[in-house]
């Protein structure tokens, strides 16, 4: 019994760590299981699919991997900034489990981020223990397991991205660096050069190296550690630090990290902060040299050099400041590109223009209206944000009293992470560790002051005096920190994201039914040369074509369809209209087909993929990228729908025109300009009004309208509209926007009421497929003479999709000099499942003629004479 009690006293923390790990497994693996292992093995988000692509290619070519990918950002190709750590970790795991492609490989990869999230309790424990104590460390390890928000979402089953490993290795680097410092401080050089002592900074160097190999911009840990040293030297009279051993630990750490990075340092032509280039190597080596210079300054200080030259105690801090200024100045003079790259890191906290439409880039504490909010703080950290802030303030107060170097270092890190968080909400997954560590400090102090630790000690045999009232209060505070945080995490962990079935089915169809599938599948697994520049189109070994969609979907198109997307989630291929740059934004927001054709011709577009999100919510992002700034996108939007107290549904140009006490539908209705864009004509109008684009595939309906279809006739416009209005009003009562399928219906309703007569393209008020694929074709050219009094010619045909939905294709052209010319994209004998089920009806005045178009005529742009 005594042995068991003794063991528990010594290793009690292990039981808490095991409990934390089990809770983490529940949140990260068990909760989202059914959303990942479903109709396929569904990886989350976008970037995990690109890792899947890289890992599949690496397994095929092991141990070689690609550093340039001509399969994306077509036709130029992209340099690959996804680091080797996760690529090789996933490849080795796939090889070990004989899962080298497809669903079996994705099943293995799905567990990697969750494992990283579970293991994160260890570096958080280490870091907290080295700065505070074991009790706070155990609490921090428990808290990091239940932090909700970005950290949870990026360490959940299926989300195989490097983000969890960024956070993991950054905290590991800080923890092992401070561990090395704590083990070295107070010892002479001969003792610290022993194998056991040297192991500490070597391990720290390995963790920094792995951090950079997980994320190319991970070199930022070097200036953070140098900042630790800078303040330790500048505040030498205040901070209690063993500066000599601190400098030596840094020298060894940076040297080892440079060696770890060295094999991957030359995979990009030039310097870059994100691609694997010599830049990171120079930062790490330069940091080692700077640390060595700090060591030399401290040696001079020890022998009284600064006193002898008349500088006194201010000499050493002054020397450090001068050295820092000289180094920065030399960088700007000798290598301005290097310095510019270094300073570019600062821009991550000041996103502008289109970048502000990226969800993970938007400033953390502000709404899109510019209002300050703490909503994100609650969603991403639960109660731990507030406990963490209290912990930071307490730590700052305690530092002023104790003057501890590790505590100062941790505060510098916390401040740096807070600044990053302020600028971009994506850095919430970094700040999670800050909130856990400092919440643990705050709770540990509370537990100590309120006798909870005494009560726990009494439970295993101690006889401490305590106040049960205090203990109860401590438990209440613990509950306030833990319970709401866990409840949030539990609610957020049930869904892992990723492509829905409509998207997956559409891209699987594309892979199997668009030209040259075998060539693309073979080329997908090859190694590619890395060009010196990607400013010019890549030289492909066979005739290729591009697929244009919004950048969110580029990785899915590449990984699932094995086709070449023009835009991708690296924000490549987006383009703009203000500088006339061909790309996805300039294509989809094009206000006429001729401009869209200019873009498509430049980028060799063959297929267009649109979804209901691009048609509705994501259109705003496309407009901002195209126009260059948030306010400039407003021209695509008009007024609002409302439900009045008298029970009528109305439209108002502004909120000021809405009757008092009305329910405002939280949905901006598009302006006339929107309805003239390519995105509207493709998805909303099903291609009506277009000459060179035809639908070839339609996915199933959005989920909500698929469920409505059991009670509503989707061909009955009145029933569809009433259902949409009812849903919109019911959701508006709670301030919630209509579902996307309903937004489409309301967009169509607004068009019929406001703009249809002027624009002349009839639209049926009905939902349609979530994803649509269009083919760009030359089109059959039908031309002929008309009567003298005819000013326009209209064409229509009924089209039936693979979902058995029918719609009317319409096009109207002007008559010039008694002659009309219309280009028709659909053929009646197409191999694609979407095709006309009636002849084209061509009408000029009172004359109507029918015509059947053949696939060869559409593909070759043949001219057909038909006088009216």
From Swiss-Prot:
It catalyses: an archaeal dolichyl phosphooligosaccharide + [protein]-L-asparagine = an archaeal dolichyl phosphate + a glycoprotein with the oligosaccharide chain attached by N-beta-D-glycosyl linkage to a protein L-asparagine. Despite low primary sequence conservation between eukaryotic catalytic subunits and bacterial and archaeal single subunit OSTs (ssOST), structural comparison revealed several common motifs at spatially equivalent positions, like the DXD motif 1 on the external loop 1 and the DXD motif 2 on the external loop 2 involved in binding of the metal ion cofactor and the carboxamide group of the acceptor asparagine, the conserved Glu residue of the TIXE/SVSE motif on the external loop 5 involved in catalysis, as well as the WWDYG and the DK/MI motifs in the globular domain that define the binding pocket for the +2 Ser/Thr of the acceptor sequon. Its main location: membrane. The record marks 154 as: Important for catalytic activity. Residues 1-16, 132-133, 185-199, 239-241, 304-312, 397-404, 453-468 are cytoplasmic. This is Dolichyl-phosphooligosaccharide-protein glycotransferase 3. One of its GO terms (molecular function) is oligosaccharyl transferase activity. The record marks 47, 360, 618 as: Interacts with target acceptor peptide in protein substrate. Residues 550-552 are annotated as: Interacts with target acceptor peptide in protein substrate. A motif (WWDYG motif) lies at residues 550-554. GO terms for biological process: protein glycosylation. It is found in: Cell membrane. It comes from Archaeoglobus fulgidus (strain ATCC 49558 / DSM 4304 / JCM 9628 / NBRC 100126 / VC-16). A motif (DXD motif 1) lies at residues 45-47. Its cofactor is Mg(2+); Mn(2+); Zn(2+).
């Amino acid at each position: 019994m005594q042995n068991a009690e003794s063991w528990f006293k010594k290793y009690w923390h292990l039981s808490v760590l095991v409990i934390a790990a089990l809770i983490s497994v529940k949140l990260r693996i068990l909760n989202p299981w059914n959303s990942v292992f479903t109709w396929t093995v569904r990886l989350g988000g976008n970037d995990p699919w690109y890792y899947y692509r890289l890992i599949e290619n690496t397994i095929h070519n092991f141990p070689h991997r690609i550093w340039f990918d001509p399969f994306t950002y077509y036709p130029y190709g992209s340099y690959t900034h996804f680091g080797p750590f996760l690529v090789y970790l996933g490849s080795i795991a796939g090889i070990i489990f004989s899962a080298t492609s497809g669903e079996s490989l994705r099943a293995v990869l799905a567990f990697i981020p969750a494992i990283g999230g579970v293991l994160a309790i260890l570096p958080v424990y280490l870091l907290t223990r080295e700065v505070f104590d074991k009790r706070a460390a155990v609490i921090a390890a428990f808290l990091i397991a239940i932090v909700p928000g970005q950290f949870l979402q990026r360490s959940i089953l299926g989300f195989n991205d490097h983000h969890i490993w960024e956070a993991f290795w950054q905290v590991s680097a800080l923890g092992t660096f401070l561990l090395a410092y704590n083990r070295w401080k107070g010892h002479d050089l001969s003792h610290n050069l022993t194998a056991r002592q040297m192991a500490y900074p070597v391990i720290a160097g390995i963790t920094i190296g792995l951090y950079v190999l997980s994320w190319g911009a991970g070199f930022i840990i070097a200036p953070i550690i140098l900042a630790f040293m800078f303040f330790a030297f500048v505040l030498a009279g205040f901070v209690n630090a063993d500066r000599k051993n601190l400098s030596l630990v840094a020298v060894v750490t940076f040297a080892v990290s440079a060696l770890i990075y060295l094999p991957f340092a030359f995979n990009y032509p030039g310097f870059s902060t994100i691609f694997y280039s010599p830049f990171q190597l120079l930062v790490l080596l330069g940091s080692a040299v700077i640390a060595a210079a700090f060591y030399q300054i401290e040696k001079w200080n020890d022998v009284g050099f600064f006193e002898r030259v008349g500088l006194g105690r201010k000499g050493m801090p002054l020397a450090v400041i001068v050295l820092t200024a000289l180094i920065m100045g030399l960088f700007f003079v000798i290598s301005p590109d290097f310095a510019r790259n270094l300073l570019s890191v600062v821009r991550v906290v000041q996103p502008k223009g289109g970048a502000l439409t990226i969800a993970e880039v938007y400033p953390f504490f502000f709404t899109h209206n510019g209002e300050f909010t703490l909503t994100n703080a609650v969603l991403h950290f639960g109660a731990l944000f507030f406990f963490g802030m209290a912990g930071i303030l307490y730590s700052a107060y305690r530092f002023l009293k104790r003057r501890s170097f590790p505590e100062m270092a941790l505060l510098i890190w916390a401040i740096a992470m807070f600044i990053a968080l302020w600028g971009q909400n994506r850095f919430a997954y970094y700040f999670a560790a800050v909130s856990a560590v400092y919440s643990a400090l705050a709770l540990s102090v509370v537990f100590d002051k309120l006798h909870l630790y005494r009560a726990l000690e009494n439970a295993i045999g101690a006889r401490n005096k305590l106040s049960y009232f205090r203990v109860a209060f401590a438990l209440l505070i613990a509950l306030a920190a833990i319970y709401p945080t866990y409840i949030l995490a539990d609610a957020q962990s049930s869904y892992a994201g990723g492509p829905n079935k409509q998207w997956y089915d559409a891209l699987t169809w594309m892979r199997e039914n668009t030209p040259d599938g075998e060539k693309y599948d073979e080329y997908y697994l090859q190694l590619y040369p890395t060009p010196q520049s990607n400013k010019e189109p890549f030289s492909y070994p066979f005739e290729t074509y591009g697929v244009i969609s919004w950048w969110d979907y580029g990785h899915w198109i590449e990984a699932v369809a094995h086709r070449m997307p023009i835009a991708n989630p690296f924000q490549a291929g987006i383009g703009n209209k203000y500088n006339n740059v061909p790309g996805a934004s300039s294509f989809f927001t094009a206000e006429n087909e001729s401009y869209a054709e200019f873009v498509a011709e430049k980028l060799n577009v063959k297929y267009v993929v649109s979804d209901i999100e691009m048609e509705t919510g994501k259109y705003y992002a496309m407009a901002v990228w195209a126009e260059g700034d948030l306010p400039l996108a407003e021209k695509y939007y008009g007024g609002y729908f409302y439900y009045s107290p008298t029970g009528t549904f109305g439209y108002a140009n502004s909120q000021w025109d809405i009757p008092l006490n009305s329910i405002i539908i939280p949905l901006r209705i598009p302006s006339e300009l929107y309805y003239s864009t390519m995105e509207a004509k493709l998805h909303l109008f099903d291609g009506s009004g277009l000459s060179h684009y035809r639908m070839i595939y339609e996915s199933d309906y959005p989920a909500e309208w698929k469920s409505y279809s059991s009670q509503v006739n989707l061909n009955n416009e009145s029933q569809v509209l009433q259902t949409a209005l009812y849903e919109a009003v019911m959701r508006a009562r709670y301030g919630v926007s209509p579902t996307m399928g309903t937004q489409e219906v309301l967009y169509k309703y607004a068009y019929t009421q406001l703009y249809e007569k002027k624009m002349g393209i009839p639209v049926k008020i009905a939902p349609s497929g979530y994803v649509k694929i269009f083919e760009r074709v030359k089109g059959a050219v039908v031309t002929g003479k008309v009567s003298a009094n005819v000013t326009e010619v209209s064409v229509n045909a009924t089209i039936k999709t693979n979902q058995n939905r029918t719609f009317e294709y319409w096009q109207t052209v002007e008559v010039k000099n008694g002659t009309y010319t219309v280009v028709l994209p659909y053929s009646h004998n197409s191999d694609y499942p979407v095709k006309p089920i009636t002849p084209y009806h061509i009408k000029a005045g009172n004359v109507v003629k029918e015509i059947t178009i053949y696939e060869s005529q559409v593909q070759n742009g043949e001219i057909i004479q038909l006088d009216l």
